[in-house]
Amino acid sequence: MCVLKVANQEDNVGKKAESIRDDDHRTLSEIDQWLYLFAAEDDHHRHSFPTQQPPPSSSSSSLISGFSREMEMSAIVSALTHVVAGNVPQHQQGGGEGSGEGTSNSSSSSGQKRRREVEEGGAKAVKAANTLTVDQYFSGGSSTSKVREASSNMSGPGPTYEYTTTATASSETSSFSGDQPRRRYRGVRQRPWGKWAAEIRDPFKAARVWLGTFDNAESAARAYDEAALRFRGNKAKLNFPENVKLVRPASTEAQPVHQTAAQRPTQSRNSGSTTTLLPIRPASNQSVHSQPLMQSYNLSYSEMARQQQQFQQHHQQSLDLYDQMSFPLRFGHTGGSMMQSTSSSSSHSRPLFSPAAVQPPPESASETGYLQDIQWPSDKTSNNYNNSPSS
């Protein structure tokens, strides 16, 4: 019994302490409310004071400051007395409740507006992120004109591939044990409930194309391979490249392209036989705008080559003229045969400035070595050469 009485006493003490705390919190909240109301009235009076009366002069500023302090102290004292007495005016309480309701209404309206914006933004994001299936994408059922243009660009004159699915692949995958790690496929991910989803990224625009949900990963991987062949052609990275066969090569249609020397077939004659070497045309899809650019590039290259050839001819003519003028001055009349030999040897390779001065070497000289049969001048001619003025 004593234990029960002590417990009851402790319970009573705890209840009294809790009631005291509640009273203290209530008094503090009421004091804060009174201070807030009086401060608001004081601010309103202070702001309305300059409009009702002219601004005070500098001499009376100290009096006004003292008066405002006295008003603040009196407001605080009256608020404390009202709180201690428990007399709260009804109109002020109603005003406080009205202000609280106004703030709560404004906060609720702003919260509803924000929630509505979030919901609308989410709906827009869902509409923007809505993906298309492969059939809709390539058939153009619910797709836009851009999708149709992309599909028409993809179905150009390129090589055609056929993707064949084998039954052995599914049997092999079904024979995998649970301990062995599964193979990861490109463009395939597993759903939480066990299904396998496949999707692919469109290279022509920033969008993902939904390929569907499948029972196993291999079926999803094969669906990805078929879509990748449609999108990227021979540049596609496949999960099962062994299932692809080339059905039709790239069509070689006659296009009005200016044929240049680099694109013409070259002929090489080896041991009396003529072999034609045709240029290799890449199988990748080329844009239509590359043809006029290639034409302009070929034209500019041919023009540059022609100008370079003219410059070389002009430079060689000037060198030949310099040789004709300098050799007689150096070697005199004895060096005429050497000048004729050099001019004749150069005439076979390039045109000269004056063709009349060129004489072919004798047949015996070409057979026995013309340069070895040259006779050097005697002492008299060397003395004449030393006495002759230098060029």
Curated annotation (Swiss-Prot):
Residues 45-64, 88-160, 247-290, 332-391 are annotated as: Disordered. Keywords: Abscisic acid signaling pathway, Activator, DNA-binding, Ethylene signaling pathway, Nucleus, Stress response, Transcription, Transcription regulation. InterPro entries: AP2/ERF_dom, AP2/ERF_dom_sf, DNA-bd_dom_sf, ERF_plant. Induction: By abscisic acid (ABA) and stresses, including cold, drought and salt. Triggered by YY1. GO terms for molecular function: DNA binding; DNA-binding transcription factor activity. It comes from the Eukaryota. Ubiquitous with lower levels in seeds and siliques. Signal peptide: none annotated. Pfam families: AP2 (PF00847). Residues 130-154, 252-290, 378-391 have a biased composition (Polar residues). Residues 184-241 bind DNA. SMART domains: AP2 (SM00380). One of its GO terms (biological process) is response to abscisic acid. One of its GO terms (cellular component) is nucleus. Residues 102-111, 336-349 have a biased composition (Low complexity). It is found in: Nucleus. Belongs to the AP2/ERF transcription factor family. ERF subfamily. Negative regulator of the abscisic acid (ABA) signaling pathway involved in seed germination and in responses to stress conditions. Probably acts as a transcriptional activator. Binds to the GCC-box pathogenesis-related promoter element. May be involved in the regulation of gene expression by stress factors and by components of stress signal transduction pathways. This is Ethylene-responsive transcription factor ABR1. It comes from Arabidopsis thaliana (Mouse-ear cress).
